[in-house]
Amino acid sequence: MTRVFLIAGEASGDALGAALMTGLKALSPEVRFSGIAGPLMQAEGMTSLFPMDDLSVMGLAEIVPKYPHLRRRLHETVRAVLDRAPDVLVTIDSPDFCLRVAKLVRAANPAIRTVHYVAPSVWAWRPGRAAKMAPFIDQVLALLPFEPPYMEAAGMRCDFVGHPVVAQPQASAAEAAAFRAATLGGMDGPLILVLPGSRKGEVSRLASVFGAAMGRVVARHPGARAVLPAAPAVPGLVRDLVAGWPVPVDVLDPTGLPGPDVAARKRAAFRAADVALAASGTVSLELAAAGTPMVVGYRMAWLTMQIMRRMALVDTVTLVNLVSETRVVPELLGADCEPEALADALDRTLADPGPQLAAERLTMERLGLNGEPPGLRAARAVLDGLAQI
């Protein structure tokens, strides 16, 4: 019997953990789970040590007042791992919490194998993080195909297991066509997806510049229509901010709708759109999976931007550009993220989407599309690592 202690600290980690559990049960039916789980992992049969939401804090303003509670949860988790003495501890993303747990567990019981799921982006900045985690992490499960060499160079085993985006369902052509017809209402289009982010800070920074860019696009394309799927945490803020836009926008508000309906509508919007104006982040991979070309824009505090520019090791932040080894997705960051430049980039993309569509297809192939599901690949890697001990 294989005993696995899993730790997820946020919704994305819960999804990865649930898929990993499914894979482990398929490959090793006698597997037993314990740890910290969200609703998806609990649905796979795990009882959470405490609510995963206790760990879901972001930003200094949230962390400082909750630090004593987080510290208690940290030591409670370490004690639980040591008491259960699992064959393997799998920490999933959330490095600030998870890597502290792994470090303390390794110091107290070196016999417990440690696996971290989601490699830190050392290829982009702070490369020293790999060497710092190597003394207490035996194996890393990577989502991106170019990540293993960075982890292996620091002395850890690293397996590329595929990105979860390749396993996400996509809207059918009929669903996309129905959404497009309902949204455009007989106009010629184009249909433009506006994605200013999922967090209050980034939405507040990007909404005005994205709105001004849309004003310019609609002036050039009178039949254009903007659609904005609001993230669950910010629908009210989004509505307040877009009220001042120079053009109308259809805000897809998830409030009060069942989760499956929200997800289905979002998938239809992604596939139906001619182009997207998006904040930087993993949303670029969701757009690539839907086959929608994009322009990426992002603003942050001036000091943060200067620090990032000096520390960055790559010349692009867009994952489609990185995975496809192209630079076909336009990205306008910091002071370059201004309305006229965004509108011009959207125009160019609408006029010639072909290079982006080719890069998106290549990206999905390299991330594992049409291969073994990422959760099963991750499970196989974990079990293989145990077998090598």
Functional labels for PLM-detected ranges:
Residues M1-I389:
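Nucleotide-activated sugar donor-binding and catalytic core shared by glycosyltransferases
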